[in-house]
A protein has these predicted regions:
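S-adenosyl-L-methionine-dependent methyltransferase catalytic module, highlighting the catalytic core
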Residues: 65-72, 76, 80-130
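Conserved SAM-binding loop
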Residues: 3-90
Length: 130
């Protein structure tokens, strides 16, 4: 199987590359696959992804646990998953967008990963100060 990098919620911001599959809920220039991340299962084969990028997507979804389950289903063992969300500790960032359904904290992910048996994860926390 030719494993790819899947960019979820790509919009039109990601350059074309033969190893990258850009996914979004809306069709448009720069979108390779159109589907709704809230509709499970996704039209991606088990283990098809060597890497999945989900930047500022989870806070918009109805069921983040089902989203996480699908991430693990499509990522082959040893693959990488990158998730970025606004931190719930920053109230303005977490809730300034009216389409945000819920905020997240680092412990949200650590608890989920422990339940599914992932024990060591590199994490990066960054914030902006003005």
């Amino acid at each position: 199987m030719d494993r790819k990098i899947y960019v979820l919620g790509s919009g039109h911001n990601h350059p074309e590359h033969p190893d990258v599959v850009r996914c979004d809920i809306l069709p448009g220039h720069g979108v390779d696959m159109v589907f709704d991340l809230d509709v499970i299962p996704w039209p991606i084969a088990d283990g098809a992804a060597m890497e999945v990028n989900a930047s500022h997507i989870m806070e918009h979804l109805k069921n983040p646990c089902r989203f996480m389950d699908e991430l693990w289903r499509i990522t082959y063992p040893g693959g990488q998953v990158y998730i970025e969300t606004p931190d719930a500790a920053n109230f303005d960032l977490a809730w300034c967008d009216p389409t945000h359904k819920r905020p997240f904290r680092l412990h949200t992910f650590l608890n989920y990963f422990t339940v599914i048996g992932v024990h060591r994860l590199p994490t990066v926390k960054h914030g902006w100060e003005f």
